């Protein structure tokens, strides 16, 4: 979706089918990085019923989007195989080492759950908690320890055909967990709950939170200025 929206904006398309779009934090950040806020209409919140009751705020393009729900990344696990669930990041890292090949996270660029694992691991290695929510580039100088931790964990990740494999997209990791290929992975809470309710994920796949917690995201609605029915949106 971000690439399609950016392409429509850059090519000056009009009267498209993108009247109202629903974007998570990662997708919104990507669109803004590609085209800025030029492709969206600034919202008049007075025309949006109950918007004042929504406490969540988007870190990007706040004047152009209406948050409507937040979600978080949790630790999804196979309760048939995992009897002692990690409760802290350090316990999780040790679990990964103690159970080689039984943990996976998706390629960060393909889904927010994997991105959250990487981002949280990096910032867990920075003592100042402000770093997690700051966009100040000064924190980049302190990323090395976190990336070293990810390199340290790499040999213990899921393997296929004898090689380390990072699944594609959030769904790829959840499929591995559901199929018994792994016992644990980071996953969006709403994605896990909805698929478990639909019966596509076994009931014994459960979730837990750890401390410090994984990063989350806010879902927001935006109105592209190249849609066909902005008034209706």
Report each predicted region and the residues it spans.
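Short, well-structured alpha-helical segments in soluble
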Residues: 4-15
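A residue-level structural signature of the nucleotidyltransferase/glycosyltransferase Rossmann-like core
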Residues: 19, 74, 183-184, 213
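Extracellular/periplasmic catalytic domains that process cell-envelope and extracellular macromolecules
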Residues: 13-16, 60, 66-69, 96-98, ...
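Extracytoplasmic ligand-binding site segments that recognize negatively charged/polar headgroups
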Residues: 2, 17-19, 24-172
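Oxyanion-binding "anion nests"
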Residues: 169-196
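Extracytoplasmic/periplasmic substrate-recognition and gating elements
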Residues: 187, 191, 198-233
């Amino acid at each position: 979706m971000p690439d399609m929206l950016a392409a429509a904006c850059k090519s000056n398309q009009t009267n498209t089918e993108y009247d109202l779009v629903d974007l998570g934090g990662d997708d919104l950040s990507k669109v803004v990085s590609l085209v800025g806020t030029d492709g969206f209409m600034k919202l008049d919140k007075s025309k949006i019923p109950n918007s004042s009751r929504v406490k969540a705020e988007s870190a990007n393009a706040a004047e152009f989007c209406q948050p409507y729900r937040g979600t978080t990344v949790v630790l999804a696990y196979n309760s048939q195989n995992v009897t002692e669930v990690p409760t802290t990041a350090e316990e999780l890292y040790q679990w990964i080492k103690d159970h080689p090949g039984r943990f996976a996270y998706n390629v960060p660029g393909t889904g927010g759950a994997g991105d959250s694992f990487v981002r949280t691991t990096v910032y867990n290695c920075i003592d100042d908690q402000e770093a997690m929510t700051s966009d100040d580039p000064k924190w980049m100088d302190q990323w090395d320890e976190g990336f070293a931790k990810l390199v340290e964990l790499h040999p213990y990740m899921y393997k296929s055909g004898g090689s380390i494999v990072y699944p594609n997209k959030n769904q790829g990791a959840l499929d591995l967990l559901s199929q018994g290929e792994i016992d644990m992975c980071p996953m969006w809470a709403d994605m896990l709950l909805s698929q478990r309710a639909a019966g596509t994920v076994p009931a014994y796949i459960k979730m837990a939170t750890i401390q410090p917690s994984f990063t989350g995201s806010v879902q927001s609605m935006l109105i592209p200025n190249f849609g066909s029915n902005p008034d209706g949106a």
